[in-house]
């Protein structure tokens, strides 16, 4: 600890750093934290920065879309008409892929392991916040009964939050009876946060197609996240995600459905990856 010399002017003494107000993370973004990889834009954000964005939007009653990119979405995007609309509407695009984190490091970008950011990385902090602040949280997705089961389990753990789940098994065509009923149920619930888990690209297309009919809420496509909350799927240990081998856990759990995603689709990204490497080498000259 600093000791003031005898007779020194107290006004000139350096301040005690421990007395200074500390913030757990920066509240201002740096320009270099929005980067382009494989032709698409992503935000290098910590989980706590995502939650700060969510909290601010809820407080302001502001609609905001938080999308995410991984290898699967980067493969689907140029092959799925209409999917890009969701990313054009998004205020934040999380980076949900440890291999992509490693790739951005290779390109010399300002990425770190903690920039891997998706629902499973901040779920506990999110639900604690929702519980404390009394948020209304709605989930649309999953098989019949799964969303309701997840909502029931989460409500037992976080009674301060109002949590509801709606099945994702409905006709999502605009103007259909099923879609109209779901939109009416969403508006009636008036969520602060809306999770949509229908799998890529259906969830992205549904949000983009219906954005004007959705309430002013924070909206996030989250895939099978609530299958984990309902206990119908087992999430990989988080250390596997940090090491970039979570895909192996999921592949062995469901090889028939995921073989193409993990063993075929990445090969189609080699061309754009080489393009990024060439551009990075050109910048360093």
Which residues does each PLM region occupy?
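Short glycine-rich anion-binding loops that position phosphate/pyrophosphate groups of nucleotides
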Residues: 70-73, 100, 198-203, 225-226
